[in-house]
C-alpha cells in the first residue's frame, strides 16, 4: 500500500493590493482596437468605464500596487492596454507558452482563464447568470457609436 504524506501550511498573508476585474470591447477581434474598458474594484464594487485604453492604464497605475484580472486577458485584453514590446520586456510568470501574469508599473495583469478554464458563458451559467450577447457590430468591427447597451454588456 502506498503512503502519502500531507504537510500543512499556513495561508500567505494578504498583500494588501487592490484587485480589479476588467473587460475590453474592441472594434472586431483586434485586441489593439479598444473601444470600451470596464472595470470593477472587487473589494468595493465600484465600477468604472473608460473610452480610452491609456486612461484605463493610467487609472490602474494610479492605484498600484494592484492586480487586474481579465478572462482570457493574457491572450487578448492585455494587448489593448500594454504594447507587445512592453509585455515582452515585462517581468512575467509563465510556464512554457502560457503566461499567468505580466507586471508593468506596479500593476499585475492576470488571466482568470488559468483559474477558471471555462468559456465565459460557462462561468456565468455556473453561478446562475447569463453572459449576455456581444453586440454584433463589435464582432464585425463596424461600431460607429458607443451605446449605453454596449457599456452595460461590458460591465456584466
Across the structure, where does each feature detected by a protein language model lie?
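N-terminal accessory regions of nucleic-acid-interacting proteins
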Residues: 1-20, 24
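Intrinsically disordered, low-complexity regulatory regions enriched in Ser/Pro/Gly/Thr
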Residues: 13-14, 31, 62
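Conserved DEDDh/DEDDy metal-dependent 3′-5′ exonuclease domain
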Residues: 19, 38-146, 156
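Short acidic, Gly/Ser-rich segments with clustered Asp/Glu that frequently serve as metal-coordination loops
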Residues: 24-31
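Extended non-globular scaffold/tether segments
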Residues: 32-37
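Flexible, low-complexity linker/tail segments at the boundary of structured domains
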Residues: 150-154
Amino acid at each position: 500500500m502506498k503512503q502519502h504524506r500531507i504537510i500543512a501550511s499556513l495561508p500567505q498573508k494578504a498583500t494588501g493590493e487592490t484587485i480589479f476585474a476588467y473587460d475590453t470591447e474592441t472594434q472586431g477581434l483586434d485586441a489593439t482596437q479598444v473601444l470600451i474598458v470596464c472595470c470593477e474594484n472587487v473589494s468595493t464594487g465600484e465600477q468604472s468605464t473608460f473610452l480610452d485604453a491609456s486612461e484605463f492604464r493610467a487609472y490602474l497605475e494610479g492605484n498600484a500596487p494592484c492586480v487586474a484580472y481579465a478572462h482570457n486577458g493574457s491572450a487578448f485584453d492585455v494587448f489593448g492596454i500594454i504594447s507587445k514590446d512592453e509585455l515582452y520586456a515585462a517581468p512575467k510568470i509563465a510556464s512554457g507558452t502560457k503566461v499567468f501574469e505580466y507586471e508593468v508599473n506596479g500593476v499585475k495583469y492576470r488571466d482568470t482563464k488559468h483559474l477558471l478554464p471555462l468559456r465565459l458563458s460557462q462561468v456565468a451559467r455556473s453561478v446562475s447568470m447569463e453572459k449576455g450577447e456581444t453586440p454584433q457590430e463589435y464582432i464585425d468591427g463596424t461600431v460607429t457609436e458607443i451605446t449605453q447597451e454596449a457599456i452595460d454588456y461590458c460591465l456584466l
